[in-house]
Amino acid sequence: MSILRPSKEAILDDLRSFVLNEAEERTGFLATAVSKLNVVRRVQQGQKLSFNEPYLALILQGKKKTYIADKSFTYTAGDIVVTNLSLSSRTVVQEASFEKPFLSIVLTLDPLILSEVARRYGFDASEQADAPAMAVSQANSDFLLAFARMSRLLQEEQRGLPFDKFYYEELMLRLLASDLGRWACDLISPDSRVSKITKAVEILKKDFKESIRVGRLAEASNLSLSSFNRQFKTLTGTTPLQYQKQLRLYEADRLLRFEKRSVSQTAFNVGYSSLAQFSGDYKKFFGVLPSQVCPHAS
């Protein structure tokens, strides 16, 4: 006796309804009541700069193109996207409208849980991608159904029960078993290039306001200075000091937009000693002067 399975399009339709119900009229990157589970709804086309932690995303509707250094990645409905490193990227929403918004589900990747799932089910974490820190692939029906089960935690109000951990681990298992599994292994293998560079990234994220020697980052990554610089740029598209500057500017943007800090206060809070240098860097990165973002901040 055969058991009827829903079609991929039917599963995607259910997940679109879930995201629309969860987002209501809100737009942007939206956290849900389930840990690590987020939804995205965008109604306008255009470019956006963003800084993202490692994630697994399922695209439900619309089209995006992401640029990391000299590489680009295009994804649309039914695609799975994975990143295994904290990255700054330029993303262009190519298809989105109020009537038909861009929709996706985004899971934050937890290296500890991913590593435990890999160990429990015997995945060889030493199999590495040796490729950019982002990858795109088509989701199969099993992957889509795993996302559907995770989404029902909100629909059926099962929050707080062990189901959230169970369904999250199932998605990590699906990821490891997919053709994107090598990117996931890069995140958890201690000998992978991603894991080594991640040690430097963690220092940069923690001490981005301070002056940091590149030699210190290379030592933390257990790489020679030349190898470290080469591998860092291959993965992130920037030099370590450019990466640090981006961290400062993203934090400055947050302080200006959401905490309404003054430009001078913001500049010094993120590690700049020169207000003119800060204003110049901010405009070059975001396209506007910081004084235009929050002109009335005290």
Feature map (PLM): residue ranges:
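N-terminal regulatory/effector-sensing and dimerization cores
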Residues: 26-126
